[in-house]
A protein has these predicted regions:
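Beta1/beta-strand and adjacent pyrophosphate-binding region of the FAD-binding site
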Residues: 5-17, 155-162
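Conserved acidic residues
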Residues: 10, 108, 130, 157, ...
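A structural signal for isolated positions on well-ordered beta-strands in alpha/beta enzyme cores
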Residues: 12, 45-47, 87, 160, ...
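Hydrophobic/small residue at the entry helix of a nucleotide-binding pocket
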Residues: 18-19, 23, 167
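Dinucleotide-binding/catalytic capping subdomain of oxidoreductase cores
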Residues: 30-51, 59, 169-227
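N-terminal Rossmann-like dinucleotide/flavin-binding domain of flavoprotein oxidoreductases
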Residues: 37-45, 52-109
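Short hydrophobic core segments
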Residues: 108-115, 160-162
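Glycine-rich dinucleotide-binding loop and its adjacent helix/turn
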Residues: 119-198
């Protein structure tokens, strides 16, 4: 057995969301194939550090509650964590519990897979006014993020959503649904259901999607009014 075969690399991964977990799995697979050729050996220990009490990041706390099937991806991630060469440490926050110097002193490499943890600044006049929110904070609320808001103001009769991507569609869809519909078809957190029922009432406001023309908007409004 060569010296490289006896060497065990130590890798630290910051963030145990999909990117961190899959990167760990891919690294171990590639190391078995190419490690000896590259002089790295074929063995490694990967330590995953997650600041939340649970892993899987946006799969758990970023997918809209009315898409529970997408959250089944977590089962595949759990299988990856069954690998004895991957070790998960939750409730460990980079910059608070461990520093880069700490990690570099103990590991051969450090991978950051922290994702987008903050909203992108809007950089528009009035963006700092009351009633203007970033989607990330709203998503944290309706997904029950551990440190997210427990209450959210839902009394507005008219809401403008800036953007037309997947998150914008999720936000618009959540705003227009009533509490009974959410309870029946989603895994919405209990405090959010109560907030919808108490503040929004039974008739949520209509939403006009950005990916359609005036005719489609008119037909959507007519359909809601029963015309």
């Amino acid at each position: 057995m060569t010296e490289s075969e006896n060497t065990e690399l130590r890798i630290a991964v910051i963030g145990a969301g999909p990117a961190g977990v899959y990167s760990s799995d891919i690294f171990l697979r590639q190391l078995k194939k190419l490690g000896e050729e590259l002089g790295l050996g074929t063995k490694a220990r990967i330590d995953l550090f997650e600041k939340l009490p649970v892993p899987f990041g946006l799969v758990r706390y970023g997918v809209a509650p009315d898409h529970p099937s997408i959250k089944f991806i977590a089962s595949a991630l759990e299988k990856t964590l069954d690998n004895p060469d991957i070790h998960l440490y939750c409730d460990v926050e980079f910059g608070k519990d461990v520093t880069l110097d700490d990690l570099l002193a103990r590991y051969d490499a450090v991978l950051f897979a922290t994702g987008a943890v903050k909203d992108k600044p809007l950089n528009l006049p009035g963006a700092d006014l009351d009633g203007v929110y970033g989607a990330a904070k709203f998503v944290e609320w309706y997904d029950g993020y551990p440190t997210g808001a427990r209450e959210w103001p839902l009394t507005a009769e008219n809401v403008a959503v800036i953007g037309g991507g997947n998150v914008a569609m999720d936000v618009a869809r959540e705003l227009m649904r009533n509490a009974d519909d959410l309870k029946a078809k989603t895994d919405y957190p209990g405090q959010c259901l109560r907030g919808h029922r108490q503040q929004q009432g039974e008739n949520p406001p209509p939403v006009h999607p950005p990916r359609c023309g005036p005719g489609q908007v008119q037909r959507a409004g007519a359909a809601r009014d029963g015309e």
